């Protein structure tokens, strides 16, 4: 039984799965974005984030650990020189998974996994005009409550009329409708 066993097997032997993820991490760090299935992307995320954390450490031992997993020396250099410094202020969460839909051939759910880019440029907020200026420029509109009876006879209630007069007018209209 497979109780308490973490990770996805993805229908592959252990050696095949390890080789596949080594290739995927190398491609991901080289291109900074790849398209794959949802399950592979979710599993790749943890491995890639561990590699970026090694890159942030930056010592010789971390470089050797990364080189033992990543297949291309140029990608290891890129990890330590360009990718890791980009995330020096960020504690985890270096990747993003965006779902794309399904693959037409086998109906597999596809995703794009990419490195998160920092948003440096923020839009400046425009100053809003004061509300008092807006109210002063608006034309004055007379307030009159118009009540319609079922017989389509409009009953206009005056602005300063007492509530009892309004109720009488409504009752009068309802009496005519019956």
Swiss-Prot record:
Region described as Disordered: spans on this chain: 150-178
Entry-linked PROSITE patterns: RIBOSOMAL_L17 (PS01167)
Keywords: Ribonucleoprotein, Ribosomal protein
Biased composition (Basic and acidic residues): 168-178
Domain of life (superkingdom): Bacteria
One Pfam entry name: Ribosomal_L17
GO terms under biological process: translation
Cellular component aspect of the GO annotation: cytosolic large ribosomal subunit
Quaternary data: Part of the 50S ribosomal subunit. Contacts protein L32.
Name of the molecule in the record: Large ribosomal subunit protein bL17
């Amino acid at each position: 039984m497979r109780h308490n066993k973490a990770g996805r097997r993805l229908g592959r032997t252990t050696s095949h799965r390890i080789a596949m993820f080594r290739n995927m991490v190398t491609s991901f760090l080289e291109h900074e974005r790849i398209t794959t299935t949802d399950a592979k992307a979710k599993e790749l995320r943890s491995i890639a984030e561990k590699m970026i954390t090694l890159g942030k450490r930056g010592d010789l031992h971390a470089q050797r650990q990364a080189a033992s997993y990543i297949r291309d020396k140029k990608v290891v250099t890129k990890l330590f020189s360009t990718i890791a410094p980009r995330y020096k202020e960020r504690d985890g969460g270096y990747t993003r998974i965006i779902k794309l839909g399904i693959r037409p051939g086998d109906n597999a759910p596809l995703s794009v996994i990419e490195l998160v880019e920092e948003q440096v440029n923020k839009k400046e907020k425009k100053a809003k005009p004061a509300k008092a200026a807006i109210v002063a420029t608006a034309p004055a509109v007379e307030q009159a409550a118009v009540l319609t009876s079922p017989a389509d006879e409009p009953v206009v209630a005056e602005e300063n009329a007492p509530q009892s007069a309004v109720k009488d007018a409504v009752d009068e209209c309802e009496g005519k409708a019956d």
